[in-house]
Amino acid sequence: MWPAAVAQNTSPDLAGAKSYVLRATPETTQWGWLDSNEKPKLVINSGDTVAIETLLHSMDQIKPGVSIDEIVKLRLANPGGGPHSVTGPIYVNGAEPGDTLEIHIKKIAMKEDGFNFNLPGKQFPTVGLLASEFPEGHVQYFKLDAKTMTTEFKPGIVLPLKPFPGTLALGPDPDEPKEKAGPPIHDAKGRTSTLRPWKNGSNMDVNELQEGSTLYLHVFVKGALIWMGDSHCLQGNGEVNLTALECSYKEIDIQPVVRKDLHIDWPRAETSTHWIFMGFDEDLNEAMKIAVRNTIDFLADQKMVPMSREEAYSLTSMVADCRVSEVVDIRKGVHCMVPKSIFTKK
């Protein structure tokens, strides 16, 4: 839980919590758009657990044997929207705008197919860090071994699998700023594209959000509205060619908890070893500044070892590991990691 020194009442009463399953079907999954007016597919209470199934990109249409040309056609079939298949939304009783939703990622179980692709740079010259240098596009498929948690890239190269959700979104921010680049954020129906990360989470691509981690998101709409998708089984920081090792999940089990006592603007996360602070902007330098400011805010506000804002800035410079989450989602992402081990006062 987030430190009691920062927010009180961090052990909510979860007596009576229930467990649910939300399968991914055409009725429970949307392709590339978030819509706060979408009818909830499940209604839960704070502290309940949900096992969510997810699909591969483009409503499970990218599977072994599908060519890069066919992937291009699928991409063009949903202009402005993301390629992501997102399961939801899930309505959380009691969640109100201004609250924080604390989302525990309890378990991730993969399906067996995965892929990575980059779109043809000659057709999509700005999609992917080096798109113009790779004009033809490329797709590669993988079989994922859940027992060994590995996959073979090619003979002689075996990859360890580290699954995490690339997209975990709450209902969109009604005041999200207008796009500075790329296709419009909103379509004619008022839906929000899953392409860009923002304060409500969405396409964050932070590879630390693995099993056992906890994500904290600002609630913008009544009921919070949780969507899950863009399932990843491995990703390097940067996600440079456009995609990770994209996959889908038999289930990702989450436990959302409504926090009335914690108020944040930007996404935060924690693992057993680190606190994590995020920033997103079309300008990578601005994304870095946002993430660093959020780190400083946390350190200056925490009461475990009180410090000035100047001391927090200094400490951030010495211990925060600020990583480029992704550079391919129009809004670029940075996440700064502060090790918990530096706080030795009991």
Kindly give the residue locations of the regions a language model identified.
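Intrinsically disordered, low-complexity linker/loop segments enriched in Gly/Pro
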Residues: 107-209
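Short, structured beta-strand/loop micro-motifs enriched in basic residues and often containing a Trp
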Residues: 24-35, 79-87, 192-200
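Conserved mixed alpha/beta catalytic, RNA-binding, or beta-rich assembly cores of soluble enzyme
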Residues: 161-167, 172-174, 178-284, 296
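A generic structural signal for residues embedded in beta-strands
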Residues: 52, 100-103, 217
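Short, Lys/Arg- and Gly-enriched loop/turn segments at beta-strand edges
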Residues: 57-69, 108-119, 223-233, 326-328
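Short, well-ordered loop/turn sites that connect or cap secondary structure elements
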Residues: 44, 92-95, 209
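N-terminal, Lys/Arg-enriched amphipathic/low-complexity engagement segments
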Residues: 12-78
